[in-house]
Every structure is written in structure tokens, then in C-alpha cells.
Swiss-Prot record:
Species whose genome carries this gene: Syntrophus aciditrophicus (strain SB)
Metal-binding is among the record's keywords: no
Subcellular location: Cytoplasm
This protein's name: Methylenetetrahydrofolate--tRNA-(uracil-5-)-methyltransferase TrmFO
Source species, domain of life: Bacteria
Stored InterPro entries: FAD/NAD-bd_sf (IPR036188), MnmG-rel (IPR002218), MnmG_N (IPR040131), TrmFO (IPR004417)
SUPFAM superfamilies to which the protein is assigned, alphabetical: FAD/NAD(P)-binding domain
Gene Ontology molecular function terms on file: flavin adenine dinucleotide binding; tRNA (uracil(54)-C5)-methyltransferase activity, 5,10-methylenetetrahydrofolate-dependent
Matching Pfam families: GIDA
EC number per UniProt: 2.1.1.74
Main location class: cytoplasm
Annotated function: Catalyzes the folate-dependent formation of 5-methyl-uridine at position 54 (M-5-U54) in all tRNAs.
Keywords: Cytoplasm, FAD, Flavoprotein, Methyltransferase, NAD, NADP, Transferase, tRNA processing
Gene that produces this protein: trmFO
Cofactor section: FAD
């Protein structure tokens, strides 16, 4: 491939714009395809690039928070999106929020300063058969392009809705009130943490759950729920006993404290190899975040639960990245195709941007005939990349950045010091990685 070959990027959202910026700054020619204003998705309204569809907040700006550290890492990697956010920020306390119109205009202006950028406003319906391409079309990828993606990945690896259960930080679980067991497990060394309930406890939980406030549907979301991934509150709404034959069924479980089968059981499944996160099995939900905290903390052992990820069900086109992508974000079966942004299975503005940044750097190295060295897992960026490329593909679901994804700190660390220690280590690791990778070029 000659140096003059233009790299195609499909999608002018946060990830696509960030990938373009990284490539342009390294001297590459880029053709950015954006279907607006010729065609609009059901959620988009503006004709500008990098439109923020939902909130105007990029979440916490505090370095001790994983989201804050991820943003700081991107700043140190010359992120266009972070420069735009800082330049167009509006008062939002400890969060980073932006004037969304000024934000988009800033990004568009900076990109258009590069003579090697070509922007083509048209819908791409088929993935190019040759030439380097980054697919960064986001959660509302058009139907025609989705079909093309399914054609190269396989239908079973492309999803159109999230059905996400809450994830709890392991060190916030009260282990005196839970027990380890799998169904029909005789030796008691099971793979699940179990939270048992008696009849009265269960009925109070069921009543509270059915009365919980749920998130309103967005205009572009029209749910026809699959029976296999119904929201927990919808199952509960079908009758007081339905959960006992579904996510809270007690069959095959024996509580070691009583020697008997509990009336109801909630199971927690390990979410990552480090066992720092646990998933509440089968509890996908449309409850608001406030209600999730209130109601799910009624579960024995979760009275002080800290949520690394809240449950949700929403429109979201994404691929099963662990099954499909290399750590370089290349498709395993077609090395000229890279994926970036939310379609890879990250969740959120900054996470999508981060994967756009990674894709841009990775494509640049590949274009030069070199191998891309990902950031270490101690960094927020590296942890996200690990999540989408090195997770059990059978259990894969989109995730925001949180400290549970990052390699655990050595030794015992006080909770109030944990965020600061994680952040300090992440930024030190990033600096070493930047030094090592720059020395190679």
C-alpha cells in the first residue's frame, strides 16, 4: 500500500473524528464518510460532525475517578475530542460538560484545517473490499451497513440491543451474608456468589421492584422485548411468583447456614478474571439509576453495594469484539478492516473516543508496516481495550470505564485511597508506554 493511499473512516461521530485527527497528525490522508445531512438516524438532528445525541456531559473530571483518569490519558495523547471539550466546557461542578454546538463546531474546524482530509457526505452501505477502513458508525448504525457488517462478521456476532445486568464492585459485597455455590453443586466450591431470601423478604423485594421508576423510552427506541432478556421488573410484573421460576429460582441451591433450599436466590457471577467485579445474573433492567441503588441494595449482601455499571436495555448496535477483533482493533478475518467507538462494545462518549484514538494509532502503525503496541492494562485506555478484546465472548456486554476493569493494585489498599493510587499508577504507566513507543520510531 503506497503512502498516498487515503484511509477511509466510516462515521463522523466522536470515534471517527478522533481517529481521523490522530491519523492526520501523523501525515496520513483520510477520507471521512458521514451520511448526515443526506440521511439522518432517528436520534441525530445536527448536520455537524461529532454530534452529542444524549447528554452534554462527559462525566467526572476528577482524576481519582476512572472516567477522569481516562480523560487525562487522552489529553496526554493529543486527543481532539478532549481539546474540544476543555475549550467549550460549561459549569458542571466536578463533571466536564460542554456547549454541544460549540463543541461540534470546534472539532469540525480543527479537522478541516488539514488539506489531507476529504469529507464525503453520503451513506456507506457496503464495506470496501480493499484499502484500510475504520468502521466507527456507532450505536445507531444504518440497517444497510449493519447487514454488510453482519456479512463479514456473521449474524450471531452482531447485536442490536443491550440487555445489561448491573455490575457490583467485589469489595463492596458483604461476604458474611452471601455463600459460594453453583446449582446442584455438591462440594460447595461453586462459581457463583448466592444471596438468599426468605418468603417475607422476597415478597417485599418483589413489591418494591414492581413499583420502581423506569427510564422513559427515547424517540428512536421501540422495544419488542425478547423473552430471553426481559427486564427484571417486566418479569416481576407478570405475577408475584414469576421471578421464582426465572432469575431468582432457588432450585439446586442449598444455603449452608440452614442446610435447606432458600425461598429465593439472587446469583452474582464473576465478571472479570481478577474477580474485582460481579454481575447480578439476569437482572437486566430499565429502572433508573437511583432506583437500582435503592432496590438492589435490598438484596442480602448488597446493602452497601457500589455499582461499577448500572443495568440497562437500549438500542445499541455493537459487535462481539472478543470473538472478532485483535488487540489492534483489526478484524481477525480481514486485516484491512478496523473497528472503533461504541460499535466495539464500549459504552459512553469518552470510551468511544478512546477507542477511536486507539484505532487511529493502530491503523497508522499498520499502514507503515509496523505492529501496534497497545497501552498496558494498568492504564484506563489499556483496560478498555482489554475488555473488548480479551473478555469471555459468551458473556460479552458493553461497559463504561471503571476501576474494576483495570489490573488490581498490589496489596491491601484503603478504599478512600484506591482511586488516587489507580490514577497515579495509570498515568505513570501511560508515560512509560509513550516513551517506549516513541523510542521505536
Amino acid at each position: 500500500m503506497s503512502k498516498n493511499d487515503s484511509i477511509a473512516i466510516i462515521g463522523g461521530g466522536l470515534a471517527g473524528c478522533e481517529a481521523a485527527w490522530q491519523l492526520l497528525n501523523k501525515g496520513h490522508s483520510v477520507t471521512l464518510y458521514e451520511m448526515k445531512p443526506v440521511n439522518f438516524s432517528p436520534a441525530h438532528r445536527s448536520s455537524h460532525l461529532a454530534e452529542l445525541v444524549c447528554s452534554n456531559s462527559l462525566r467526572s473530571n476528577i482524576i481519582e475517578n476512572a472516567a477522569g483518569t481516562l480523560k487525562e490519558e487522552m489529553r496526554r495523547m493529543n486527543s481532539l475530542i478532549m481539546s474540544a471539550a476543555d475549550a467549550t466546557s460549561v459549569p458542571a461542578g466536578r463533571a466536564l460538560a460542554v456547549d454541544r454546538r460549540a463543541f461540534s463546531k470546534f472539532i469540525e474546524k480543527k479537522l478541516k484545517e488539514f488539506p489531507k482530509l476529504t469529507i464525503i457526505h453520503q451513506e456507506i452501505t457496503d464495506i470496501p473490499a480493499d484499502g484500510l477502513v475504520i468502521i466507527a458508525t456507532g450505536p445507531l448504525t444504518s440497517d444497510s451497513l449493519s447487514q454488510s457488517i453482519a456479512g463479514i462478521t456473521g449474524n450471531s456476532y452482531l447485536y442490536f440491543y443491550d440487555a445489561i445486568s448491573p455490575v457490583i464492585e467485589a469489595d463492596s459485597i458483604d461476604y458474611e451474608k452471601v455463600f459460594r455455590a453453583s446449582r446442584y453443586d455438591d462440594d460447595g466450591q461453586g462459581d457463583y456468589l448466592n444471596c438468599s431470601m426468605g418468603k417475607e423478604e422476597y415478597e417485599l423485594f418483589w413489591k418494591t421492584l414492581t413499583e420502581g421508576q423506569t427510564v422513559s423510552l427515547r424517540d428512536f427506541e421501540d422495544y419488542k422485548y425478547f423473552e430471553g432478556c426481559l427486564p427484571i421488573e417486566v418479569i416481576a410484573g407478570r405475577g408475584v411468583s414469576t421471578l421464582l421460576f426465572g432469575p431468582m429460582k432457588p432450585v439446586g441451591i442449598v444455603d449452608p447456614k440452614t442446610g435447606k433450599q432458600p425461598y429465593a436466590v439472587i446469583q452474582l457471577r464473576q465478571e472479570n478474571r481478577e474477580a474485582t467485579l460481579f454481575n447480578i445474573v439476569g437482572f437486566q433492567t430499565k429502572l433508573t439509576w437511583t432506583e437500582q441503588r435503592r432496590i438492589f441494595r435490598m438484596i442480602p449482601g448488597l446493602g452497601n453495594a457500589e455499582f461499577a455499571r448500572y443495568g440497562s436495555i437500549h438500542r445499541n448496535t455493537f459487535i462481539n469484539s472478543p470473538a472478532l477483533l485483535e488487540k489492534t482493533l483489526q478484524l481477525k478475518t480481514a486485516e484491512h478492516i478496523f473497528f472503533a467507538g461504541q460499535i466495539t462494545g464500549v459504552e459512553g462518549y469518552i470510551e468511544s473516543t478512546a477507542m477511536g484514538l486507539m484505532a487511529g494509532l493502530s491503523v497508522s502503525e499498520f499502514h507503515k508496516g509496523k505492529s501496534f503496541l497497545p497501552p498496558p492494562p494498568e492504564t484506563a485506555m489499556g483496560a478498555l481495550l482489554n475488555h473488548i478484546t480479551d473478555t469471555d465472548s459468551k458473556q460479552f456486554q458493553p461497559m463504561n470505564i471503571n476501576w474494576g476493569l483495570v489490573s488490581p493494585l498490589p496489596g491491601k489498599v484503603k478504599k478512600r485511597e484506591r482511586g488516587e493510587r489507580y490514577a497515579h499508577r495509570a498515568l505513570e504507566s501511560l508515560a512509560r508506554w509513550q516513551s517506549e513507543t516513541s523510542a521505536e520510531h
